[in-house]
Amino acid sequence: MNVLVINCGSSSLKYQLINSDTEEVLAKGLCERIGIDGRLVCQKAGCDKEITEASMPTHKEAIQMVLDALTNDKTGAIASLKEVNAIGHRVVHGGEKFASSVVITDEVIQAVEECNDLAPLHNPANLIGIRVCGELMPGVPQVGVFDTAFHQTMPAKAYLYGLPLEYYKNYKVRRYGFHGTSHSFVSKRAVEFLGLNPEDSKVIVCHLGNGSSISAVVNGKCVDTTMGLTPLEGVVMGTRSGNIDPAIMEFIAKKENLDISGMMNVLNKKSGLFGLSGGLSSDFRDLNEAAEGGNQDAANAIDVLAYGIAKFVGGYVAAMNGVDAIVFTAGIGENAIPVREKVVSYLGYLGVTLDKDANGHRGEEIVISTPDSKVKVAVIPTNEELAICRETVALV
């Protein structure tokens, strides 16, 4: 079966065509600057990237270009669209309505629309992708895979905020969590890779990238996660603040003469590693290079990140009453050797010891703790597209 995996953003669209039998990526690509000027970067397996500048006024033109690229003589991986057997869509927010992936129907589309106010930048774009694919490839089954679904197993003590209860009852204000597809994929793989008992396992997944979240997973089910109602909560991220004292918002807003939108822009786009480094960069690689060159602000930003991760890990060990494995994934988690080393340096009380040679590897599935470490620590590359493909195949 060939599955087209679509991740539709507000002005971009990522895709992969995956053979579900072999789990081989047949083709992949990215549409950028949709609604502005438009650019398609596509790559057939085993071939060089092809870049096409073209007008993409809407997502419909972008998706049509993707479908053309999949079937043309130069970049095509299939002879015709009849070889696309199913489409899997990333959907950011399913609220409390979706605890698992679902086959797309009119009723599902309506329910996703009802979650739009929880993800006003992402859900409408996800829905556009679903509708356009339905229009251009009628009859091909579509599946929605939700970022929030994996976290729906959290108990009330983990997802409720210390706010008036009517805000939850009336507006569904609660912790939802994100990166669920990645956390699910990596936690399952950790159990397999590390030889844990799936029915008696406690795993902490550290998904660390430009956006970062940590989750506590007991016997394959999420019991807590760091992101909240929105992806702003939790650890320090590329440009997001993570956890702060909420009263800071009023204090800074008065000092800087900002309204609520202006303050949210600061927290989402000017804070995190970018803010802590004095606006140097939100990219860990830049900060690490600067820190090695003596930039103290960059070094402090990295320290704040590692310290915050270690605190959440410690909290989740308490929440689960123990831990079998701690896993790093995503861009920083898979590649940032210093961050992993700094985080593990705080975990001596757990009997964790780091194999520095193993930790020197980047982007590989590898155990980075020593054989005598009481808790296993590993790096496991995430693959959200493959996870969406698997979810899609399971439902169609």
Model-derived regions: residue spans:
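Short glycine-rich, Thr/Ser-proximal phosphate-binding strand/loop in the N-terminal lobe
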Residues: 3, 12-56, 228
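Glycine-rich beta-strand-to-loop/alpha-helix junction loops that act as flexible
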Residues: 9, 89-92, 208, 327-335
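Phosphate/pyrophosphate-binding loops at sites that engage ATP/ADP/AMP, CoA/4′-phosphopantetheine
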Residues: 69-84, 190-197, 313-324
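Short beta-strand-loop/turn "lid" adjacent to the catalytic site in phosphate-handling enzymes
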Residues: 70-122, 143, 149-160
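Glycine-rich phosphate-binding loop of actin/hexokinase-like ATP-binding domains
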Residues: 150-255
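Catalytic phosphate/nucleotide-handling subdomain of diverse soluble enzymes
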Residues: 218, 224-259, 265, 330-361
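A mobile "lid/hinge" subdomain adjacent to the ATP/sugar-phosphate binding pocket shared
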Residues: 256-301
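Internal helix-turn-beta structural module
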Residues: 297-299, 303-324, 333-396
